Amino acid sequence: MNWFVEGLMYVLSTVGALLPIVNPLSAVGLVMSITADLTDDERTDQIRRACIYMFCILTAFLVAGGLIMNFFGISIPGLRIAGGMIVSYLGFRMLFPDTVAISMQERAEASAKADISFTPLAMPSLSGPGSIAVIIGMSTTVQTGTHIVLGYVQVAIGIAITAFISYIVLRAATKLDKVLGAVGMNAMSRIMGFLLICIGIQFVINGVLGVVHGA
């Protein structure tokens, strides 16, 4: 029973680390703007495919994370520090927004595309640099454990749950936009930004401690 509880906690920790970074609420406005000319069924299809692409992208980096780090000679503490800086930067941009994540030109190009599920929805909106950095970090953590295959499966389940939550949120984009409004969406985005800063700073602290202990 203990192994089940430990596995469940690992899955939930994966969701807890990924969800604030993926932040599907921040993509609601993008979905509403670039799918304005689509029917509900077409919008749902694009959202579903985007979330599937997100799962595939992050799972690919989960599997290849160790290979990438070994190829470039990146240490785990170094990855944690770099990932923490990226996550903190994304958090600061959400907490103190001064520029739009996607320019008007990119929005216009996306609106003109027949398929917007891969870009800009799946990448970079849902699976951007921050979430990729976190997944690569989890990949290296799994490889240092005793049950590598089980660890990969647990993280993959966490990614799948995050993708499903993102699908539910984006599927309800129209209702969320009406209920929360611009002010509510902005407030939620700032809260997520603060959480990202906390997560990023903790990544940096863990990375620095790893360097100190390894010296």
Describe these PLM feature segments:
Residues M1-P20, P97, M104-A122:
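Small-residue-enriched transmembrane helix starts and helix-helix packing motifs
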Residues M1-V15, N70-I81, T144-G158, V212-A215:
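Interfacial loop-to-helix junctions that mark the boundaries of transmembrane helices
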Residues Y10-L62:
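Juxtamembrane transmembrane-helix termini in multi-pass membrane transport proteins
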Residues L19, V28-I34, T119-P124, I132-T144:
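Generic transmembrane alpha-helix signature in multi-pass membrane proteins
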Residues T39, A60-G83, I165-G210:
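Transmembrane-helix boundary and interhelical-loop signature of multi-pass inner-membrane proteins
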Residues T39-I52, T146-I157, N186:
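Membrane-interface alpha-helices at helix entry/exit sites of multi-pass transporters
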Residues T44-D98:
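Membrane helix-loop-helix hairpins that form the core translocation module of multi-pass transporters
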Residues I86-R107, I199-G210:
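Transmembrane helix exit motif
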